[in-house]
């Protein structure tokens, strides 16, 4: 591609509304332009990257035995009503009506559509397993679109859905797709980790996320420093402290703590560490047959944070997790929120494993402006349950039994689920088994955020000058930068020759034939992130050489004119 015939719309200044580096560089490099909140037009350079990522994903899906299909973006509401997600999905589901006042949705995902299709096309176990995928635009009406294409409302996604006669077949395909995801992200040159994850609104029994490690990531992942264990912090298990709980030695004493509300306030006022304090949070229970909701006390160590995903999965706890309001706190504990404690609390008490290991601890006295010191389990609180309630912290022992946990930020670029029969049962998708009996199909679903991958790759691959693309997903693999070619016929001729040879070898090459100053040309090529560059000048041609420049390492070297094309072909595997 010649720049004189290309839309190369680079910007010198960083747009003020771009928060993360990927958004800044995608705008500056002329990859995208904002159309509306969370919606972007892809310009040629951005689309070239998007297509390369899409092709890698397609190849790995085909290698895994998946078959490509295409489904409508607009979906009839009755399918979502049939699955039960019409009411459950929330305001992110964009709903619309046609001229006949029939309700539809803009598809955020396609479980309902694919299940409806397959239930009419597949009727025998002989047609299973079946794995179908598409690469298509999705729409989710995010409350706060941000970070460019990282969290947009419209985005490109690969979504696959598998159908099986039994759980064993589902697990086999799930593992094959897990391997395909790893292969795809490795080919893209990404530093990523597969992690155990919550199934969220999609549902199902088992789930893994694929996280690209980056400081700008919205997710926090925990992984062992010595094994391959990794989990989203929502799912990472916090083990109980080792050893026996210390014996009680202090008497239970009520002390006045006026105007003390937070854990830090209590610790400072009583001269104790937050680790010696038990904090109590009140949440609502599931409604009984009369619609009434009791209040449940969740107790954690003062320095730990409640893991809301773990909490809402506890038997009897309302889902979604709902914290008691001031009026409910007053009715249940008889005090303000800052003075709640487990001693004397009349309702159900669930204690985190670490908090259950405390002895002689400080807690609220269930009387506004007072706390208790010297509190102890069993002696002062007879009835309670113990569960894993907290977020893990760095340095916790790994749940796998090997090493300690490290915490890193990640960008979720893929998510796979073992759905089981959640959708197939609701939508009556069944087949006849070998014995002629009708059985509900087991399902899996597998998503990759194709457009998000562009931003994630930039978050990992950039410097002060711009993007540094891995070869496999770069918009162009080689840039030809001829110095003053419009004043030097031999520079122009040599550039033309390299361009023709590289194109013939199947290399994506950008020939900068603009009438621009060399500094502008170099800056644009670095901003765009072209991995390899040939710089041609009269002085070098006098000596039979050109300059090769590697974008990632910054390495520069003189290479013979007769050898540069072969060297580049070797680097690119051509």
UniProtKB/Swiss-Prot annotation:
GO terms for biological process: prolyl-tRNA aminoacylation. One of its GO terms (molecular function) is ATP binding. It catalyses: tRNA(Pro) + L-proline + ATP = L-prolyl-tRNA(Pro) + AMP + diphosphate. Its EC number is 6.1.1.15. NCBIfam families: PRK09194.1 (NF006625), proS_fam_II (TIGR00409). Transmembrane segments: none annotated. This is Proline--tRNA ligase. Its main location: cytoplasm. Belongs to the class-II aminoacyl-tRNA synthetase family. ProS type 1 subfamily. It is an enzyme of class 6 (ligase). Keywords: Aminoacyl-tRNA synthetase, ATP-binding, Cytoplasm, Ligase, Nucleotide-binding, Protein biosynthesis. One of its GO terms (cellular component) is cytosol. It comes from the Bacteria. Pfam families: HGTP_anticodon, tRNA-synt_2b, tRNA_edit. Homodimer. HAMAP family: Pro_tRNA_synth_type1 (MF_01569). Consists of three domains: the N-terminal catalytic domain, the editing domain and the C-terminal anticodon-binding domain. Gene3D superfamilies: Anticodon-binding domain (3.40.50.800), Bira Bifunctional Protein, Domain 2 (3.30.930.10), YbaK/aminoacyl-tRNA synthetase-associated domain (3.90.960.10). PANTHER family: MITOCHONDRIAL RIBOSOME PROTEIN L39/PROLYL-TRNA LIGASE FAMILY MEMBER (PTHR42753), PROLINE--TRNA LIGASE (PTHR42753:SF2). It is found in: Cytoplasm. It comes from Aeromonas salmonicida (strain A449). Catalyzes the attachment of proline to tRNA(Pro) in a two-step reaction: proline is first activated by ATP to form Pro-AMP and then transferred to the acceptor end of tRNA(Pro). As ProRS can inadvertently accommodate and process non-cognate amino acids such as alanine and cysteine, to avoid such errors it has two additional distinct editing activities against alanine. One activity is designated as 'pretransfer' editing and involves the tRNA(Pro)-independent hydrolysis of activated Ala-AMP. The gene is proS.
């Amino acid at each position: 591609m010649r720049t004189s015939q290309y839309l190369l719309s680079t910007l010198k200044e960083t747009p003020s509304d771009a928060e993360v580096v990927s958004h800044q560089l995608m705008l500056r490099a002329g990859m995208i332009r904002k159309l509306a909140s969370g919606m972007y037009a892809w310009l040629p350079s951005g689309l070239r990257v998007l297509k390369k990522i899409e092709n890698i994903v397609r190849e790995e899906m085909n290698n895994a035995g998946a078959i490509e299909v295409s489904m409508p973006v607009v979906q009839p509401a009755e399918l979502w009503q049939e699955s039960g997600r019409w009411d459950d999905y929330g305001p992110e589901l964009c709903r619309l009506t046609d001229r006949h006042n029939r309700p539809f949705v803009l598809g955020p995902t396609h479980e309902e559509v694919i299940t409806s299709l397959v239930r009419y096309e597949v009727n025998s176990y002989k047609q299973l397993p079946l794995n179908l995928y598409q690469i298509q635009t999705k729409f989710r009406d995010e409350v706060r679109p941000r970070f460019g294409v990282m969290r947009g409302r419209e985005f490109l996604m690969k979504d696959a859905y598998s159908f099986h006669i039994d759980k064993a077949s589902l697990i086999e395909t799930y593992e094959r797709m897990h391997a395909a995801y790893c292969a795809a992200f490795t080919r893209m040159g990404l530093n990523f980790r597969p992690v155990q994850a919550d199934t969220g609104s999609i549902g199902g029994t088992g789930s893994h996320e694929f996280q690209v490690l980056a400081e700008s990531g919205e997710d926090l992942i925990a992984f062992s420093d010595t094994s391959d264990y990794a989990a989203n912090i929502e799912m990472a298990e916090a083990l109980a402290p080792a050893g026996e709980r210390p014996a009680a030695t202090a008497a239970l004493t009520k002390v006045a703590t006026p105007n003390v509300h937070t854990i830090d306030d209590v610790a400072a006022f009583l001269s104790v560490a937050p680790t010696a304090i038990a904090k109590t949070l009140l949440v609502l229970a599931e409604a009984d047959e009369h619609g009434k909701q009791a209040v449940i006390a969740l107790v954690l160590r003062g320095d730990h944070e409640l893991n809301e995903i773990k909490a809402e999965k506890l038997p009897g706890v309302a889902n979604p997790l709902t914290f008691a309001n001031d009026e409910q706190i007053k009715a249940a504990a008889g005090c303000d929120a800052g003075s709640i404690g487990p001693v004397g609390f009349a309702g159900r008490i669930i204690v985190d494993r670490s908090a259950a290991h405390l002895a002689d601890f400080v807690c609220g006295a269930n009387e506004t402006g007072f706390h208790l010191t010297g509190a102890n389990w069993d002696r002062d609180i007879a009835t309670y349950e113990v569960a894993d309630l907290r977020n893990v912290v760095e340095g916790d022992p790994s749940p796998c039994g090997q090493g300690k946990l490290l915490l890193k930020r990640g960008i979720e670029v893929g998510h796979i689920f073992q759905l089981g029969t959640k959708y197939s049962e609701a939508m009556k998708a069944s087949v006849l088994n070998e014995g002629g009996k009708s059985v509900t199909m087991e399902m899996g679903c597998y998503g990759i955020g194709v457009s998000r991958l562009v931003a994630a790759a930039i978050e990992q691959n950039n410097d002060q000058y711009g993007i540094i693309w891995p070869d496999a997903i770069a918009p162009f693999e080689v840039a030809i930068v001829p110095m003053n070619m419009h004043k030097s016929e031999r520079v122009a001729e040599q550039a033309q020759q390299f361009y023709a040879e590289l194109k013939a070898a199947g290399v994506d090459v950008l020939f900068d034939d603009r009438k621009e100053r060399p500094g502008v040309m170099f800056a644009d090529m670095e901003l765009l992130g072209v991995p390899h560059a040939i710089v041609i000048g009269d002085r070098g041609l006098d000596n039979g050489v050109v300059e090769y420049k590697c974008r990632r390492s910054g390495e520069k070297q003189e290479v013979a004119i007769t050898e540069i094309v072969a060297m580049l072909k070797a680097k690119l595997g051509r």
